[in-house]
Amino acid sequence: MTALNDTERAVRNWTAGRPHRPAPMRPPRSEETASERPSRYYPTWLPSRSFIAAVIAIGGMQLLATMDSTVAIVALPKIQNELSLSDAGRSWVITAYVLTFGGLMLLGGRLGDTIGRKRTFIVGVALFTISSVLCAVAWDEATLVIARLSQGVGSAIASPTGLALVATTFPKGPARNAATAVFAAMTAIGSVMGLVVGGALTEVSWRWAFLVNVPIGLVMIYLARTALRETNKERMKLDATGAILATLACTAAVFAFSIGPEKGWMSGITIGSGLVALAAAVAFVIVERTAENPVVPFHLFRDRNRLVTFSAILLAGGVMFSLTVCIGLYVQDILGYSALRAGVGFIPFVIAMGIGLGVSSQLVSRFSPRVLTIGGGYLLFGAMLYGSFFMHRGVPYFPNLVMPIVVGGIGIGMAVVPLTLSAIAGVGFDQIGPVSAIALMLQSLGGPLVLAVIQAVITSRTLYLGGTTGPVKFMNDVQLAALDHAYTYGLLWVAGAAIIVGGMALFIGYTPQQVAHAQEVKEAIDAGEL
């Protein structure tokens, strides 16, 4: 013990006699992005754990946002039966989410620029998660619709902010390309999962279709807090008034169309809702003309080609949404499919739409956008015409049902690509982001607006044929037959809307070269090369 102490004492005396050398100064550690942080003992051929965590956090929100726009479709009949919803209330379970999601999307993106994208993203995910709990415990129509409205607000805050976080979290090159690809893939995966997983969970209880969001949301919040970094804040005046007025105008219009068939088109509540929609729309135009940072810059609408393109995008989004909802309700209400079978039966539609998107992406540089859009519109028209004549109670899945949804899916996919690229054709580099966001907003808002009209047609036709509204479990054979004919009659209106989209495309004057250039610029931006 003494020898040990003497040794220690000798070492200390030797080190004390040496000249003192200050420790070298380490450069301050800069804040690193998720893909730049080294992982000691982690295989170099695999993405880093930080990269994976960031991708899961950002891509997960896009997955949930897409899932919840489709999951309610297969759950609607059971929700209507358990909560005794009217047909108007049933439609609101879907449209409430899409209205606030689409209407507040642009505001959500700018909110991230103003107060920080990481903070905004976490707030949006938290609101979405809490709203999912409220959806699951809803005890009547009002609470469920309010919870769905809140869910849409959460998605509108988190989803566009998540896309912006891809650019600030991952450096240019393979890391950002991979993250962008994952983010884009979540849309397609979410569409399928919303139908299949939603259908499977609905077989147990429709409430589980919303509760499944809760653990995923909590994991995303944790990963976002640990794997994402905060961005610089910009001083920007938010056009909250414009975004709220636009959402209010669309909501009031949808409400008027949804209650018109049951309450009467000349009833006080229907006319009042229409007047509110008109007043909100006029106020929106006035506000946008004077706003410092308008949600919708009106100078983008001075180009006739772009104005027609935006109108076609609005209607095409409505056609796609209405087709999905109408077929989803038809196979359960009339054909008696279970929720799971209905969800699985829709997978060919998603695959067909992907095929249409791929084919159109290859042809868009060779043919003018009007040719591809008209071709897609006529494919959809033929599919809906076929469905209106050959779909009836007791028909087999193949070919009577699978034929129209596959052909219709290809048609929609063919029309979407040229319309989306036409929206950004000829605009400046700094305007591509805002114009793309406006196109996405119009596509989202087109869904509830067109569905409200189609649902009003179906309800009016049902009542005209001696049927009734409400849960199908209370209907007799005569009333079910009336509802059957009303659904197929509604498909004729969807077919008519597809023809109108094709007619609008006749007035789109962009050339294949302009659209091909827009496609190249967009791909370069998505890849982080510009």
From Swiss-Prot:
TM helices/strands, residue ranges: 51-71, 92-112, 120-140, 151-171, 181-201, 204-224, 240-260, 267-287, 307-327, 344-364, 371-391, 401-421, 438-458, 489-509
Keyword Protease: no
A GO CC annotation given for this chain: membrane
Record's bilayer topology term: Multi-pass membrane protein
Pfam families, sorted: MFS_1
Induction (UniProt): Expressed during infection of macrophages. Down-regulated by the nucleoid-associated protein Lsr2.
Region described as Disordered: 1-38
Compositional bias annotation for Basic and acidic residues: 1-11, 28-38
Single GO term (MF): transmembrane transporter activity
Keywords: Cell membrane, Membrane, Transmembrane, Transmembrane helix, Transport
Side of membrane Extracellular, spans: 72-91, 141-150, 202-203, 261-266, 328-343, 392-400, 459-488
Domain of life according to the entry: Bacteria
Cell location: Cell membrane
Residue ranges that the UniProt entry lists as topological domain Cytoplasmic: 1-50, 113-119, 172-180, 225-239, 288-306, 365-370, 422-437, 510-530
CDD domains: MFS_MMR_MDR_like
Similarity annotation: Belongs to the major facilitator superfamily.
This protein's name: Uncharacterized MFS-type transporter EfpA
